[in-house]
């Protein structure tokens, strides 16, 4: 029996699904530009949202300059940011990652 490898992207091909990339951020000016650029390159049809959680640096400015939609969440804490993202954004597929470019 021959095995067939199916990638998730193959399952969604030609389905015109809306994809939202959600990036909760706090003081990520050093990395957020690269993170947004990398997601734009990998998922060119996705909408990229950066949720800034009271950053004191240029996180929001840099993310916006790279083409992300920036929203502010004034209630401090990642849990508040995540709840706000899923309340605000309507999409068929959600991709959430941190804005600090870490991969686990």
What is the meaning of each model-derived region?
Residues 2-104:
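Structured catalytic core of nucleotide-sugar glycosyltransferases
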């Amino acid at each position: 029996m021959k095995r067939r490898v199916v990638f998730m992207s193959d399952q969604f091909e030609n389905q015109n699904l809306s994809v939202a990339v959600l990036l909760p951020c706090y003081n990520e000016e050093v990395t957020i530009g690269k993170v947004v650029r990398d997601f734009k390159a990998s998922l060119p049809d996705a909408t990229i949202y950066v949720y800034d959680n009271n950053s004191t640096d240029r996180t929001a400015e840099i993310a916006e300059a790279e083409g992300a939609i920036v929203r502010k969440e004034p209630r401090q804490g990642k849990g508040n940011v995540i709840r706000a993202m899923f309340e605000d954004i309507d999409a068929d597929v959600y991709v959430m990652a941190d804005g600090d470019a870490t991969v686990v």
